[in-house]
Structures are given as C-alpha cells and as structure tokens.
Regions:
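Conserved glycine-rich Rossmann-like NAD(P)H-binding loop of the short-chain dehydrogenase/reductase
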Residues: 60-78
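Non-catalytic terminal and boundary segments that flank Rossmann-like NAD(P)-dependent oxidoreductase
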Residues: 1-39
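The beta1-alpha1 cofactor-binding region of Rossmann-like NAD(H)/NADP(H)-dependent oxidoreductases
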Residues: 72-73, 97-111
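Rossmann-fold cofactor-recognition segment
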Residues: 82-104
C-alpha cells in the first residue's frame, strides 16, 4: 500500500512490497508537480484511482485535479477519499462522468479544463489512462466494422482528440511545463495471438504519442507500462485466458510513475516499463 503525508515542506511516500508487510523502500522528497492542472482519465478504478491518490500528494496549493470516468458514483467516492488531502492543500477537484468514446464526453472534459485555464497554472499534466480489453478472439473473427471502430474510438481516437483539445486550451508559453502520459502495455511492443484489438490500440497509441514528442519539443511525453496489476481488467484477462499471473497492487506502479514524473529526466517519447526502471 502507498501512503503519503505532508510534513512541513516535505512529502514522504512509502512503498510496501515485502510479504511480511515491512516497507522495503523509504524516500522523502520536497519536490512537487507545481501549481498544476492534472487530468486523469479512467480515474474511478484500479490504476487511475491509485494515480489520483499519488498525484494529489504532490500538487501545490491552488492546483486543479480533473478526474474522468464513466461512473459518477465511483468518482464521487474517490473525491471523498481525497478530501482530507485536497482540503489541506487547497486543491480544486472536478469529477466528470463521461464516455470518452463520444464527442459529448470529450467536449465536456475539454470545457471543464478550459474554465480552469488561468495564468497561475505552471504545469499541465494529462494522464491518458482510460482503456478497455475488448474482444479476445482470433484475427479472422473481426469482420464487423462497427465493433472494431467502437473499440478503437474509445481506446485510440479519444486519447488523440482529448490531448489535442487540451493542447489548444493550454498552448505552450514561457514558464508552462507540459507533460503527457500514455498508460501503455508490453503488448504495445509484443504481438499476442487473439489480442489483435488490444495490441493494435496500444501500439498505435505509442506511435501517436511518439509523433507528439517529435512535433512538440516543449511537451514531455512518456508511454508507461505499469505491468500486470490487481484490476478488473486483469481479472478479465485471467478469466478469459486461464493464465494466472502474480498481480501488482496498483499503488506500486503508480508510485513509480510519480517518481519518474518528479525526476523528469526521461527522454520525451520514451516507453518505460515498471520492471525495468
């Protein structure tokens, strides 16, 4: 489990991995993400939820946290979980219940971000986490164009359109730091039989954000593979494939991503994996 608490001007975070429950990593950092507007998609469950907890510990007073997911109830529960941190650090939290595969959902997310587009913000952090598993079937079964388009609309197109929309709301200017995170997978790099939809979307997203890194030198872009986590998606994978993997608690990959963002020394466009950094 990952915990964080503020002590004077330092933020401490703890990572527990050992089977006996004792922490094997302890670190303290005065660093923050600045006065930031942070947008997390797929925030209501699993990795996105863990990221919301991690990120909120490192935001300066007056920062804005925009949490996007389909379930309004789960988002409100998350907001309540974060209340002690957000009140202490005077954060503004918006919960957007939206389907990002639709124009309406994307437009609402951009609209809320636009209303927070004030000059005092010095860091824009967009974490494209929302994704789905899709149909695990043989390549030759995908003859329904609507099924394929629907999957790619949510898992690929939406992250392109949302990122472009937020870039337009917060154009690069002196003093503004821009970071885009693409939550990726080892299957963006490795083909797996029967996973054509998932592998295609993850690989295309990696290339899409590589293009962004080439086009926008002032935007720091990271594709991050968090590994197999204890999430509903991974449980679906185990149920469908019968393959049982040891699953990571979501807090561990979330904490490692936060360290990468705070260190900020990765090359833009990099694909980094939880197990190799």
């Amino acid at each position: 489990m990952t915990q964080c608490c503020s002590v004077t001007n330092e933020t401490y975070f703890y990572h527990q991995r050992k089977s006996d429950g004792m922490p094997d990593v302890y670190s303290a950092s005065p660093r923050t993400l600045g006065k930031c507007i942070c947008i997390i998609t797929g925030a209501s469950k699993g990795f996105g939820r863990a990221l919301a907890h991690e990120v909120s510990c490192f935001l300066m007073s007056g920062s804005v946290l925009i949490l996007v997911a389909r379930s309004e109830n789960l988002l409100q529960q998350l907001k309540e979980e974060l209340q002690s941190i957000t009140e202490e650090q005077q954060l503004v939290v918006h919960c957007i219940a939206a389907d990002l595969s639709t124009k309406e959902g994307l437009n609402e997310t951009v609209r809320v971000a636009r209303q927070e587009a004030v000059n005092e913000i010095d860091h824009v952090l967009l974490i494209n986490n929302a994704a789905s598993l899709g149909n695990i079937s043989q390549f030759a079964t995908f003859s329904d164009l609507d099924e394929v388009n629907s999957y790619l609309s949510f898992n690929l197109s939406s992250s392109l359109v949302l990122t472009a929309g937020i870039l337009q709301v917060f154009p690069c200017r002196p003093g503004l730091r821009w970071t885009v995170v693409n939550v990726s997978s080892v299957f963006a790099l490795k083909a797996l039989p029967c996973w054509v939809l998932y592998c295609t979307a993850k690989a295309a997203r990696n290339m899409m954000f590589n293009v962004l890194a080439k086009e926008e030198p002032n935007v720091k872009v990271l594709s991050y593979s968090p590994g197999p986590m204890d999430t509903e998606l991974q449980k679906d994978i185990q149920r469908l494939t019968g393959v049982i993997n040891q699953l990571l608690p979501c807090q561990e990959p979330a904490a490692k991503l936060m360290k990468l963002l705070l260190d900020n020394d990765f090359p833009s466009g990099a694909h980094l994996d939880f197990f190799t950094v």
